[in-house]
A protein has these predicted regions:
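Membrane-proximal basic amphipathic "stem/tether" segments
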Residues: 1-3, 15-21, 207-265
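C-terminal domain-boundary segment and adjacent tail
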Residues: 27-63, 155, 181-201, 241-265
Length: 265
């Protein structure tokens, strides 16, 4: 199985606005203009072998041998105001992973927005309850509470169980996967740039490729076509990122800044 999953966040009217999702310099690095997003969608339509896939639960993966998945993290307001209509005009599904404590707050989607996405056939999943800075470093009981609280809130809004989620901040660990499984999640998306799907104690773990404001149009085409060189580049940079993450401090800040400049989140 070879899946290319792209991670998007928020779409802004222009580079100077900031009316969707979390605020701050780090968050801004992942926010695109709608013009850039429109270009990406056009390139995906031209270069993808098939239309983007919909993976809402484990059984969906059994039917997918390869393909492209579009995912959107955090639950910013642009999910319904700018993203959904663009996907729906092409009959494409999106995967919207929502930080449940922020539902209805300024800059984030409301319960009504989530129901609209669900009714339109998009996947609405969890992105934790509070978006902890490093979820993998929390006590296991607290990680489980993040998943349980988020899934319960979203399920109550949608009227159906939540089976998919993405890891906030990319801080994945085995405990993060196991607690997600215990909360009823069967498909967990990470930020590790891999096209492989692994099984961790009964939960499918799916890698993803980050899209930042510096990601070039050429790179979107290469990712869409799953070219070996671009996949290897993302893997190499991710390996360096993991090493420096463990060190933290100024070294991590410097590396993260350089990764953004290279267009790799």
């Amino acid at each position: 199985m070879k899946l290319i999953t792209l991670i998007y966040h928020d779409m802004l009217v222009d580079a100077q606005s900031d009316d969707s999702g979390f605020s701050g310099e780090d968050a801004a690095s992942y926010k695109l203009t709608v013009a850039a997003f429109d270009r990406h969608l056009a390139m995906i339509a031209k270069h993808a072998a098939t239309s983007p896939l919909r993976i809402g639960a484990l059984n969906d993966l059994s039917e997918a041998s390869a393909g492209l998945i579009l995912s959107f993290d955090d639950g910013g307001a642009s999910g319904t105001s700018r993203v959904a209509a663009r996907l729906e005009s092409r009959a494409w599904p999106g995967h919207f992973f929502v930080t449940s404590n922020f539902i209805g707050q300024k800059g984030f989607m409301s319960a009504t927005d989530l129901r609209r996405l669900h009714a339109a056939g998009h996947v609405v999943g969890s992105h934790s309850a509070s978006h902890p800075t490093r979820i993998s470093r929390l006590p296991q009981a607290q990680i489980l509470a993040e998943w349980n609280d988020s899934c319960a809130r979203i399920a109550d809004i949608l009227g159906s169980a939540v089976h998919s989620a993405s890891v906030p901040g990319g801080f994945y660990s085995r405990a993060v996967a196991e607690t997600a499984r215990d909360a009823g999640i069967s498909v967990l998306f990470t930020s590790e740039p891999t096209s492989a799907v692994s099984n961790v104690e009964g939960i499918a773990v799916v890698g993803r490729f980050s899209v930042t404001r510096r990601t070039s149009d050429k790179e979107i085409v290469a990712l869409t076509e799953a070219r070996a060189a671009i996949l290897a580049r993302h893997q190499l940079l991710w390996g360096a990122k993991k090493i420096v993450k463990r060190v933290g401090g100024r070294a991590w800040i410097a590396v993260r800044k350089r990764l953004f400049e290279l267009g790799v989140g």
